[in-house]
Structure formats: structure tokens, C-alpha cells
């Protein structure tokens, strides 16, 4: 017969092990596991140039926390579509040039995009893209007149956070460990629960 105190300690230890393993898998602050290869989640910090609508206003830099991720479908299989999502849930289509680390916002019909803090993301054209100096992160700006009025053109520079994505093999190992620990916990719990009955039958 297994001592009741010992069985309780073993069950508690196994449950703690399972919780710890699941925490490693699911906690974004420790290790992030990509659940599929078609969509890659990234956290970015976007630096946006802002200005008032009059031409004499000073330009200033502001940081806006956002999420940016890449969508792949049939049309964008080899050219992933970048989507910027703000804290308020608004989404902006963009293009991402990984060589210089800049997000380019596609602007077909919209001129201004509102952020939660009231900041407006400045839009980009080809001439501005060619004026980027990536080493010092100095960006130039231009102004473009559209049918909707003045629209400021500028660059949103993104800095990607360093986050480690586990390989398929590592994910498989973590899942196997978790399933094994969970199975051990269930079996031990059943054994300890049925142990008094076995002793009675014996």
C-alpha cells in the first residue's frame, strides 16, 4: 500500500511539472511556438513621423505599439501581404521590405489612418523610399496633393523584437513531453484513487 502523504506529494509534483511544461509552450514571454507556417506573427514598434496639416509645423517622431503580421494566400503566396493592426483593431495593408526594414503603407484610396493616440500614419511614395538612410534612421518626407486634399508622405520605420520561434522538431519534443507528463498524472491519479480498492480486494 502506498502511503497517502507520499502519493499526494507525487501527484502535486507531477501536476506542477505539467503546468510548467504548458507554460513554456504557451507563454509568449518565454518561448513562442508558431502553430502554422502560413501566418507569422511578429511584434513591432513602429516609429511614425507626424505633423499638423499646415506646412510650418515641426515634424517629430513618435512611437506607436502595433502588431504586424504577414498573410499568405493563393494571390500572395510568394509576396506575403503585410497587415498592420492597431490596438483599436483597425487594420492597414502595407508592404514590408526586409532589406531595409521599412513598412510601406499601400494607399489606393485612403489618405490618413488614425491611431489610438490620435497619431496619423504618414503615407509613402517611391521618391521617399529612395531617400531613406537606414544606418542613422533618418527619413525624409514629401507632400502629395490628392483629390482629398493634402496628404503627408513619410516613412514608418519598424524595429522587430527578437523572438525565438521553435523548430518543428523542438515543438514535437515539447508536445511529447507534455502529453507524457499528462498521461503520467492521469495514470498516477487513477492508481492512487483505486489503490484502496485493490488493498481491500487483496
Curated annotation (Swiss-Prot):
Keywords: Glycoprotein, Membrane, Signal, Transmembrane, Transmembrane helix
Membrane topology per record: Single-pass membrane protein
Record GO cellular component, one term: membrane
Residues annotated as transmembrane: 172-192
Superkingdom of source: Viruses
Signal peptide positions (record): 1-20
UniProt subcellular location: Membrane
Glycosylated residues (UniProt): 54, 107, 112, 125
Keyword Transmembrane on entry: yes
Entry protein name: Glycoprotein U22
Amino acid at each position: 500500500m502506498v502511503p497517502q502523504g507520499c502519493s499526494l506529494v507525487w501527484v502535486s509534483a507531477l501536476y506542477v511539472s505539467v503546468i510548467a511544461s504548458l507554460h513554456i509552450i504557451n507563454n509568449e514571454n518565454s518561448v513562442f511556438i508558431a502553430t502554422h507556417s502560413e501566418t507569422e506573427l511578429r511584434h513591432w514598434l513602429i516609429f511614425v513621423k507626424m505633423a499638423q496639416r499646415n506646412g510650418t509645423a515641426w515634424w517629430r517622431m513618435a512611437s506607436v505599439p502595433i502588431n504586424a503580421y504577414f498573410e499568405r494566400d493563393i494571390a500572395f503566396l510568394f509576396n506575403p501581404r503585410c497587415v498592420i493592426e492597431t490596438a483599436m483593431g483597425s487594420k492597414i495593408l502595407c508592404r514590408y521590405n526586409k532589406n531595409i526594414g521599412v513598412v510601406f503603407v499601400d494607399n489606393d484610396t485612403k489618405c490618413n489612418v488614425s491611431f489610438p493616440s490620435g497619431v496619423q500614419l504618414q503615407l509613402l511614395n517611391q521618391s521617399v523610399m529612395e531617400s531613406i538612410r537606414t544606418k542613422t534612421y533618418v527619413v525624409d518626407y514629401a507632400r502629395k496633393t490628392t483629390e482629398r486634399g493634402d496628404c503627408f508622405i513619410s516613412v514608418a520605420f519598424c524595429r522587430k523584437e527578437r523572438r525565438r520561434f521553435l523548430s518543428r522538431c523542438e515543438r514535437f519534443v515539447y508536445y511529447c513531453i507534455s502529453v507524457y507528463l499528462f498521461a503520467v498524472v492521469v495514470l498516477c491519479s487513477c492508481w492512487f484513487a483505486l489503490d484502496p480498492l485493490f488493498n481491500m480486494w487483496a
